[in-house]
């Protein structure tokens, strides 16, 4: 059975390979340090049969954004700088790609961000897509490209709340 849990030293970070050296290195060398320092939180997708093997991971953090770069129609709605959530990284192991693991983790990340938004103010979620394929993946969840920055994407918190309620994910854990 698949589950998502916080990254710990017990997880086998060295064996993880998503095909992107920068993401592999982050998980292996930096993620636990950033958790310890309170910079970000990394969550891993594991199977209960082999709970130390990482099938995928995502990292969440907070950020401060310059709102003049927001997509048309959003830039003028906020002060010059505003707080937001950042999906800093999302990766799936090569042997698990194209099996819905990314969508599973994205849904979990959005759920966690919604919980945060109930307690602190954020205008939405930001993500830096690595390439056009990644951008296409995020756009299916409603992300919009920033003005003049086609690989930097934004999902307004109101859009996330509305989509979540319409899909009735509230009953999932």
Q: Where in this protein do the model-derived segments appear?
A:
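Short glycine/proline-centered loop/turn elements that form peptide/ligand docking sites
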Residues: 106, 131-134, 150-157
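Conserved active-site alpha-helix within GNAT-family acetyltransferase domains
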Residues: 114, 120-122, 128-148
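A short, internal acetyl-CoA/4′-phosphopantetheine-binding micro-motif in the GNAT/acyltransferase core
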Residues: 88-98
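Short amphipathic alpha-helix that is part of the acyltransferase structural core
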Residues: 1-33, 37, 42, 53
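Conserved acetyl-CoA-binding loop-helix of GNAT-fold acetyltransferases
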Residues: 98-112
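Conserved acyl-donor/pantetheine-binding loop and adjacent beta-alpha core of acyl/acetyltransferases
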Residues: 53, 57-89
């Amino acid at each position: 059975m698949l589950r998502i849990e916080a990254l710990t030293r017990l997880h086998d970070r060295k064996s993880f390979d998503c095909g992107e050296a920068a993401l592999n290195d982050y998980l292996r060398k930096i993620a636990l340090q950033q958790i310890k320092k309170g910079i970000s939180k990394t969550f891993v997708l594991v199977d209960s049969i082999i709970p130390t093997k990482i099938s995928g991971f995502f990292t969440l953090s907070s950020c401060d954004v310059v709102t003049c770069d927001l997509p048309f129609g959003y830039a003028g709605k906020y002060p010059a700088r505003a707080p937001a959530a950042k999906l800093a990284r999302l990766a799936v192991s090569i042997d698990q790609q194209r099996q819905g693991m990314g969508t599973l983790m994205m849904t979990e990340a959005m759920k966690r961000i919604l919980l945060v938004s109930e307690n602190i103010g954020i205008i939405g979620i930001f993500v830096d897509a690595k390439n056009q394929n990644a951008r296409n993946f995020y756009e299916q969840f409603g992300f919009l490209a920033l003005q003049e920055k086609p690989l930097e994407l934004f999902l307004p918190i109101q859009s996330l709340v509305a989509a979540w309620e319409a899909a009735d994910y509230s009953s999932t854990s």
